[in-house]
Amino acid sequence: MTRNKFIPNKFSIISFSVLLFAISSSQAIEVNAMNEHYTESDIKRNHKTEKNKTEKEKFKDSINNLVKTEFTNETLDKIQQTQDLLKKIPKDVLEIYSELGGEIYFTDIDLVEHKELQDLSEEEKNSMNSRGEKVPFASRFVFEKKRETPKLIINIKDYAINSEQSKEVYYEIGKGISLDIISKDKSLDPEFLNLIKSLSDDSDSSDLLFSQKFKEKLELNNKSIDINFIKENLTEFQHAFSLAFSYYFAPDHRTVLELYAPDMFEYMNKLEKGGFEKISESLKKEGVEKDRIDVLKGEKALKASGLVPEHADAFKKIARELNTYILFRPVNKLATNLIKSGVATKGLNVHGKSSDWGPVAGYIPFDQDLSKKHGQQLAVEKGNLENKKSITEHEGEIGKIPLKLDHLRIEELKENGIILKGKKEIDNGKKYYLLESNNQVYEFRISDENNEVQYKTKEGKITVLGEKFNWRNIEVMAKNVEGVLKPLTADYDLFALAPSLTEIKKQIPQKEWDKVVNTPNSLEKQKGVTNLLIKYGIERKPDSTKGTLSNWQKQMLDRLNEAVKYTGYTGGDVVNHGTEQDNEEFPEKDNEIFIINPEGEFILTKNWEMTGRFIEKNITGKDYLYYFNRSYNKIAPGNKAYIEWTDPITKAKINTIPTSAEFIKNLSSIRRSSNVGVYKDSGDKDEFAKKESVKKIAGYLSDYYNSANHIFSQEKKRKISIFRGIQAYNEIENVLKSKQIAPEYKNYFQYLKERITNQVQLLLTHQKSNIEFKLLYKQLNFTENETDNFEVFQKIIDEK
């Protein structure tokens, strides 16, 4: 069996003559003249050579992006014959196909069994071939699946000896690109439209390119082609284009098109000489527009963020200095001026929710029925318990105080339509002003004497907890700042911090770094760098007051808080805990994220998808350290939220392979439910830690998901992850083959093996490697030492 390898050749082969100078004593040629002539020729030759290299590289890139090979027993000759079909069409056609999101499969699997064709409808299976015939699907050797993105499946054959079959392949390729050229969403090319009209007047041309059904429709419509006729007969227009495409590019059929449909031949000739390139460029431009990230920038972004402008200006200096992206969750805009005035912000020791209505808006009411959870019995009960718990457990640090509103705050709430200042009333000789809101349960008033706000239940109304009461002070949660209890409002929640890798490297002691980088063994060096980045950049530890953070994240929080205090803020800290990246218990999904980039620019994304795309384009796609919340794409253990997040690199759900901790947790869960260990007759409670295979798998999974791999170059930075994934796969294979494994675990390990296969294949594809995962696995020898095996692995990947 030949080695399963797809080797792209040149798109076109240009013959070059090398000038040979035969200089003899009888030739009267000046040396300088000869040198001048040689230099000019050499420049031209080198220019052509470079151009040829560029064409070859472009063709190779087009192939790598498009073609997937699937075969087990075909010869390299047949693969080459199949590949040669693509060499006969311009690279721009392949680029059009690529821009449409298309894929091409070379396979020796029968089309009826191919995975990409299992969801075809009967109508799709009976689509026309190039002769306008509906043939049995089982007899197809090439098929174009038309959905949102085209997929072309081609059986590996010796197409060089069968011109009809090669023409059929070109017809199906033509169908793929016709999805864009002739689309219901686009205006038909006027030149092509006029061409169809002229072809309908020529019997030879129409007989060659139109189906009988289409010719009859044209006759019934008096050969009048308007927008409605095009929409009703889109498939027929696409068929005519695809058929002309096949005649033009199938070498043995080109003269037929030139003889019987010369106008169409000329049209195809124009496309080949520049038309396809224009279409490709147009699609690329559309792709840029489609991928454009819709954001607010500058002052608009800042205003929409809710951050105090002076604080944001202080933060951007830090972002510049530390070459770090600082991402914030949106701040309650009713809290912005409170923070600016010196109101304290809540940390992790207060779990009550803030309010977004009535006079308490922006604060955290002790009575949670005044919060944004108003009217929700369970949430109010839980919030009230949380507030009481905070005061009890953090006595002296957390308390409650009466709510006071000054004139400026009342005016701000009035401007936002939250309250209205109503009529004056006298109660026990004291003057109050009613504060009107849209609430149906409570009435509010403010004391003219001390600005304290009170509330009571309206006549005939009861609270969600079944209470009814007269005027009482509204109390809000407060924090002790330098001996004074200050009311609390929402803090600045960090969504993420993404420092440059050079900043993380500064955290590593120079002696430790030098010891690792001077290691001669490349794999050991990469492992060493990875371990240093884990230790100093990624390793995070729980903190009782700030949540889960790494050392550099703690330093960043200190820098941010000091910068705010320098602006004159007197409320203590404004950033009180770690990022949303580590909020795995109670994750939250925000439509808007405020970003300060390392250039000090303000940016606000407008939806969750745009946030992901921004991170992909500007952070994970460059040399910045970033990791995702591991609770995404699963039910969070705390608030039971399900938040979907797609990995910008692999385009896959990020939890497709478990982490080391999740792997052990899954095994423990099976053990608890079955009361059986991984291995038969195992009564050892600590077997997970002692069994070598389980330890190895856990270690490989830990290395696989290590964000520190981003320290390496773009070309190599995913290689370690791929290699670790393959190592985990191999160890799982060993476990499954073992006769000692308990049957209760077999399904889990099989499932895990499939997950690894799928995700590693995605990484291979992103690496632009043409090799299939299982084929790569077979070429590695796991009985060799790890370093030698890794070198073999790198060589295979680089060749592909």
UniProtKB/Swiss-Prot annotation:
Regulation: Host calmodulin is an absolute requirement for its activation. Inhibited by ethyl 5-aminopyrazolo[1,5-a]quinazoline-3-carboxylate.
Signal peptide: 1-33
Region (Interaction with calmodulin): 623-800
The UniProt record lists the keyword Cytoplasm: no
Sequence ranges assigned to domain ATLF-like in this UniProt record: 60-273
Location in or out of the cell: Secreted; Host cytoplasm, Host cytosol
Phenotype for K346Q: Loss of activity due to inability to bind the substrate
Annotated GO MF terms: adenylate cyclase activator activity; adenylate cyclase activity; ATP binding; calcium- and calmodulin-responsive adenylate cyclase activity; calmodulin binding; metal ion binding; metallopeptidase activity; small molecule binding
Region annotated Catalytic CA2, chain positions: 490-622
Phenotypic consequence of N583A: Decreases activity
Ligand binding (Mg(2+)): D491, D493, H577
Amino acids binding 3',5'-cyclic AMP: T548, H577, G578, T579
Alphabetical list of InterPro entries matching this protein: Anthrax_toxin_C-terminal, Anthrax_toxin_edema_cen, Anthrax_toxin_edema_cen_sf, Anthrax_toxin_lethal/edema, Anthrax_toxin_lethal/edema_N/C, ATLF-like_dom, EF_HD, MetalloPept_cat_dom_sf
Consequence of changing E436Q: Decreases activity
Annotated spans, Catalytic CB: 350-489
Annotated GO biological process: cAMP biosynthetic process; symbiont-mediated cAMP intoxication of host cell; symbiont-mediated perturbation of host signal transduction pathway
Outcome, altering K346 to M/R: Loss of activity
Cofactor(s) needed: Ca(2+)
Reported effect, D647A: Decreases activity due to reduced activation by calmodulin
PROSITE patterns given in the database record: ATLF
Region spans: Catalytic CA1: 294-349
Consequence the record notes for mutating Y171A: Loss of cytotoxicity due to inability to bind PA
Function: Edema factor (EF), which constitutes one of the three proteins composing the anthrax toxin, causes edema in the host. Acts as a calmodulin-dependent adenylyl cyclase by converting ATP to cAMP, leading to dramatic elevation of intracellular cAMP levels in the host, thereby causing edema. EF is not toxic by itself and only acts as an edema factor when associated with protective antigen (PA) to form the edema toxin (EdTx). Required for the survival of germinated spores within macrophages at the early stages of infection.
Family: Belongs to the adenylyl cyclase class-2 family.
Domain-related comment: The N-terminal region contains the ATLF domain responsible for binding to the cleaved form of protective antigen (PA-63). The C-terminal region contains the calmodulin-dependent activation domain and the catalytic site. This region is composed of three globular domains: CA, CB and a helical domain connected to CA by a linker. The active site lies at the interface of CA and CB. The metal ion is coordinated by residues from CA; calmodulin probably binds in a multistep fashion first to residues in CA and then to residues present in the linker and the helical domain.
Entry protein name: Calmodulin-sensitive adenylate cyclase
Gene that encodes it: cya
